Amino acid sequence: MGKEYFLKVALREAKRAFEKGEVPVGAIIVKEGEIISKAHNSVEELKDPTAHAEMLAIKEACRRLNTKYLEGCELYVTLEPCIMCSYALVLSRIEKVIFSALDKKHGGVVSVFNILDEPTLNHRVKWEYYPLEEASELLSEFFKKLRNNII
Ligand SMILES: [Zn+2]
């Protein structure tokens, strides 16, 4: 199973967030080809500003693997991680992050900040932007509805 497959699983999570009126971002963590956690943005539901999809996916993966480090794991997420999530990925020692839309306003990987390329950090997370039109479309649709007060 390739990147596109995993990004589409993450996209299904993003759609679940959309249905709940959350900013539609979904994330999954994969280890050796197996999905070990899935999450979607739950800031509204949990009343928690840090409940981004990536944070929830990291926590769930650590619980499942009973470890604080996610070495050898990859995170697939529908939107470029923000600064908080990028640094959480560094702390988790995850191997790589793959994202399918850019966040021009808050991106922590390449669009605004470059947290993962920071040479002073003691763990280097590899990253890849793998564009998926559906991922950006879902976000545009959400913000359009928000502007028109449909959500
Ligand atoms: Zn985030």
Curated annotation (Swiss-Prot):
<feature type="binding site">
    <location>
        <position position="52"/>
    </location>
    <ligand>
        <name>Zn(2+)</name>
    </ligand>
</feature>
<dbReference type="InterPro" id="IPR002125">
    <property type="entry name" value="CMP_dCMP_dom"/>
</dbReference>
<keyword id="KW-0862">Zinc</keyword>
<comment type="function">
    <text>Catalyzes the deamination of adenosine to inosine at the wobble position 34 of tRNA(Arg2).</text>
</comment>
<feature type="binding site">
    <location>
        <position position="85"/>
    </location>
    <ligand>
        <name>Zn(2+)</name>
    </ligand>
</feature>
<protein>
    <recommendedName>
        <fullName>tRNA-specific adenosine deaminase</fullName>
        <ecNumber>3.5.4.33</ecNumber>
    </recommendedName>
</protein>
<feature type="binding site">
    <location>
        <position position="82"/>
    </location>
    <ligand>
        <name>Zn(2+)</name>
    </ligand>
</feature>
<dbReference type="InterPro" id="IPR028883">
    <property type="entry name" value="tRNA_aden_deaminase"/>
</dbReference>
<feature type="active site" description="Proton donor">
    <location>
        <position position="54"/>
    </location>
</feature>
<comment type="subunit">
    <text>Homodimer.</text>
</comment>
<keyword id="KW-0819">tRNA processing</keyword>
<dbReference type="Pfam" id="PF14437">
    <property type="entry name" value="MafB19-deam"/>
</dbReference>
<dbReference type="InterPro" id="IPR016192">
    <property type="entry name" value="APOBEC/CMP_deaminase_Zn-bd"/>
</dbReference>
<keyword id="KW-0378">Hydrolase</keyword>
<keyword id="KW-0479">Metal-binding</keyword>
<dbReference type="GO" id="GO:0052717">
    <property type="term" value="F:tRNA-specific adenosine-34 deaminase activity"/>
</dbReference>
<comment type="similarity">
    <text>Belongs to the cytidine and deoxycytidylate deaminase family.</text>
</comment>
<dbReference type="InterPro" id="IPR016193">
    <property type="entry name" value="Cytidine_deaminase-like"/>
</dbReference>
<dbReference type="GO" id="GO:0008270">
    <property type="term" value="F:zinc ion binding"/>
</dbReference>
<feature type="domain" description="CMP/dCMP-type deaminase">
    <location>
        <begin position="1"/>
        <end position="111"/>
    </location>
</feature>
<dbReference type="GO" id="GO:0002100">
    <property type="term" value="P:tRNA wobble adenosine to inosine editing"/>
</dbReference>
